[in-house]
Amino acid sequence: MIVLVGSNKGGPGKSTTAINLAVGLALRGHDVCGCDADKQHSFSIWHAFRQEQEVKPEITLVQAEGNISKTLLALDQKFDFVVVDVAGRNSTEFVTAGVVADVIIAPHLASQLDMSTIEELKKQYENWQLLNEDLKLYVYHTRGNTNASVKKKERAEFLEFMSEHPELAVLDAVNYERKPYRDSIPFGLGVLELKGRGAEDAKEEVIQLMNEVFPV
């Protein structure tokens, strides 16, 4: 299965989402390959840390650029899951990956700048479905505010905006801005692999995302 993590705005946590999905799927016992198709190479940097620390389970990682559709189809023949991290803004990598993906998870912040790209995403989805009719796309609310006085209002505003785009499914799972997501990177870990109680909220968020998109 090809899982594409992408959106048209920088900064919503695409790489963080891809990393934690890859780890979560590997911990379920799947053979997972990450595909880093973003020139910032955050996925690759994290993977290098993981190799240095010799963390198990192993996750394969490849880099790709340009038209990556054939690369992804070839990887899909070898691995249970291919998790793809792409650059945004209608990049060649994003567009060509969408043609062959099984699932797209589209991280978005609850900000005007992020939400202003939803119309573009909707048009992309319509075009992908002309060639890939079984493609599923989920909008994922990311980097939410954990402040109790803001949290519910922010989520309500996100859902209200998305209600204007019923063609796009919105995940119930929400990712919040939490320190464990950052702390796990230099150790080559996903938050599910962190020890201690401080990561419990982040772990629950990843588990909810996993169970919603990839129910056991």
What are these regions (language model features)?
Residues 2, 6-8, 12, 21-88, ...:
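P-loop/Walker-type NTP enzyme "switch/lid" segment
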Residues 17:
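Hydrophobic positions on the alpha1 helix immediately C-terminal to the Walker A/P-loop
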Residues 34, 84, 106, 139-141:
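Structural beta-sheet core signal
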Residues 93-112:
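Inter-motif core of Ras-like GTPase G domains
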Residues 118-131:
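Conserved C-terminal guanine-recognition region of P-loop GTPase G domains, centered on the G4
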Residues 145, 158-191:
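Beta-strand-loop-alpha "switch" segments that mediate conformational coupling across diverse proteins
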Residues 182-203, 207:
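Inter-lobe coupling/hinge region of RecA-like P-loop helicase motors
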